[in-house]
Amino acid sequence: MLAYAMRRLLLLIPVLIGMTIVTFSIIHLIPGNPAQTILGEQASPQAIADLEERLGLNEPYWVQYGLYMKDLATGDLGTSLRTNKPIMEEIWPYLAATIELTIFAMIFAIIIGVNAGIVSAWKQNSWFDYLSMFIALVGVSMPIFWLALMEQWIFAQELGWLPAFGRDNPRDPIISTTGLYVFDTIISGQFDKTWESIKHLILPGIALGTIPMAIIARMTRSSMLEVLRSDYIRTVNAKGSGQGVVIYKHALKNALIPVLTVVGLQTGNLLGGAILTETIFSWPGIGRYIFEAINYRDYPVIQSGILVVATIFVLINLFVDLLYSYIDPRIKY
């Protein structure tokens, strides 16, 4: 297992280097002079020259890339042009907010999706099977922004059950050390604020997790049906084992392997694709952070944000690969 993990880690090195090349090249793909694009058409030649010197844009490409990699090796993502603050310090609260939202959304998607898929396969062609697969089809097809707006209208505006915006109560803000509000409030014993944080997570979490939930449900059903029709399951049934034992002890473990792939991909997609949900719910996440940087032409932030999200996506897929080898020891490639 350790040797397999080391091989997978070594294979990540060229992938990560490739990502740095792509993210670094973004600023060089801007038509015209990048410094003038950042400062605007009315900028003076001296201001443009000063910014080129500050960003190192007057150096050859390979020299700039070498300096960029040197900074990355020391944990320096650069400085925001808009706030003039180190990006490494500035980006974490936004990233933590998106991580917390993504975790909640995926917990919702996995619990509902996996169990719906299992029962649908177990009760194939029943009313539950047809209903759950219809809901899954609607979930895959439903626009996130429409679902988010309906949630706000029904549960926040009409019923008043849940908050529609933000991460916490602005009148009683949460003092966080890690940026993960639920974790921090549990550790500090502020359970009233824990519930407040969870209430703020419910609507955006469901909106963000609906599509992954539908995909996971359909994949789980398909995988379970394939496993339930295999020879070894027929043997287990012939021995008189109960349906619960057959499903959860013998079939589920093998059926989860393709589902893990979907979970890994969807988790990575949510991290980088939550911008619409974050905008509708005023969630201060990494998607909104990058979007605001695009509006302000803050290219160092754009580079760093894309690199961080891409790196997390790759690490999630590494984790899924390691889970494969744990669930099925035959997978050693």
Swiss-Prot record:
What broad taxonomic lineage does this protein's source fall under? Answer: Bacteria, Bacillati, Bacillota, Bacilli, Bacillales
> Which sequence ranges are marked TM in the entry?
10-30, 99-119, 130-150, 197-217, 256-276, 300-320
- Subcellular location as annotated: Cell membrane
Q: What is the stated purpose of this protein?
A: Probably part of the ABC transporter Dpp involved in dipeptide transport. Responsible for the translocation of the substrate across the membrane.
Native source species = Alkalihalophilus pseudofirmus (strain ATCC BAA-2126 / JCM 17055 / OF4)
User: Which stretches make up the ABC transmembrane type-1 domain?
Assistant: 95-324
- InterPro entries, alphabetized: BPD_transp_1_N, MetI-like, MetI-like_sf
Which UniProt key words apply to this protein?
Cell membrane, Membrane, Peptide transport, Protein transport, Transmembrane, Transmembrane helix, Transport
Calcium listed as a keyword: no
List, alphabetically, the GO terms of the cellular component aspect.
plasma membrane
- CDD domains, from UniProt? TM_PBP2
Pfam families, from UniProt? BPD_transp_1, BPD_transp_1_N
Any GO BP annotation: protein transport
Official protein name in the record: Dipeptide transport system permease protein DppB
What family name appears in the similarity comment?
A: Belongs to the binding-protein-dependent transport system permease family. OppBC subfamily.
Which PANTHER family does the UniProt entry name for this protein?
DIPEPTIDE TRANSPORT SYSTEM PERMEASE PROTEIN DPPB-RELATED (PTHR43163:SF6)
Q: Which domain of life is it from?
A: Bacteria
Q: How does it sit in the membrane?
A: Multi-pass membrane protein
